[in-house]
Amino acid sequence: MDSDASLVSSRPSSPEPDELFLAGRNKGGGGGGGGGGGFTGGTVSSSTQSDSPPELSAELRSAMSAAGVVVVDKLGFKSSSSSASSASSASSKKDKKQMTEPELQQLRLKINSRERKRMHDLNIAMDGLREVMPYAHGPSVRKLSKIATLLLARNYILMLTNSLEEMKRLVSEIYGGHHAAFHPAACPAGMGAHSAPLPAHPGHPASHPAHHPILPPAAVSSASLPGSGLSAVGSIRPPHGLLKSPSAAAAAPGLGGGFQHWGGMPCPCSMCQVAAPPHHHVSAMGGAALPRLASDAK
């Protein structure tokens, strides 16, 4: 009796909807029957939502919302997005509520294992970083935290970068100064020091023919030749192309242009590496110097 009374009281008191309901019921068409069924379904859902328990109302709400969307599409009205979102949220809640206790426990275990693996990988990475970092391990140093390890790694990387830049600058300055000191065009005053070690071994010219990396054996052995021999060897080797100043050429008048440059350490540039003299210049040598050069070469 209570349900019938609630059903009667839920109907509107105005006669217009009742007449529309009877007119739609009397029609024999399928569309009218479908429309009447949809209208009655709407009234039943509106009457039973307030009287049903929460679980039943949630199920009826989700079912009637889906049915309402279909009816609206048939009648040609626009479907609202709020009803669709409420239906999806209700279905998701229903799925979660329908999960049994073992399934929920399995889901919790999967989530916990994934989180545990992530933290394990992070700890392994931090331990590897602490191993290669200075000041991060020792007998009197306790294990650093993750934030302290990252800050120490950042400072260490910045320090290494600054040290590398400073080392590059120093190396460039050292090699630049070395090249300027040994190059005759950049430093003409240093040619005397280059040519000074040559007369230091007058008695042993042939015993060390291969010590000089660039000069040929004949040119190295001619350091002990007096007077005419030196002038003849000077005629063999042309003057260095970089000796443009006359003062630099007059620094050692007894030696050729090539001997003014070559000293203890040769210049590494390709222009200073003079090739061996050609054979047709040897014919211009004097008769006294040629036998001595041949004996020195042996």
Swiss-Prot record:
One term under GO cellular component: cytoplasm
Gly residues bias (residue ranges): 26-41
CDD domains with a match to the protein in the record: bHLH_TS_OLIG2
Entry coiled-coil feature ranges: none
Composition-biased stretches (Low complexity): 79-91
Chain positions covered by the region annotation Disordered: 1-60, 79-102
GO biological process: axon development; myelination; negative regulation of neuron differentiation; negative regulation of transcription by RNA polymerase II; neuron fate commitment; positive regulation of oligodendrocyte differentiation; positive regulation of transcription by RNA polymerase II; sensory organ development
Span of domain bHLH: 106-160
Keyword Iron-sulfur in record: no
Annotated keywords: DNA-binding, Nucleus, Transcription, Transcription regulation
A GO MF label: E-box binding
Keyword DNA-binding: yes
Subcellular location as annotated: Nucleus
Compositionally biased region (Polar residues): 1-13
Function of the molecule: Required for oligodendrocyte and motor neuron specification in the spinal cord.
Name of this protein: Oligodendrocyte transcription factor 2
Phylogenetic classification of the source organism: Eukaryota, Metazoa, Chordata, Craniata, Vertebrata
Gene it is expressed from: OLIG2
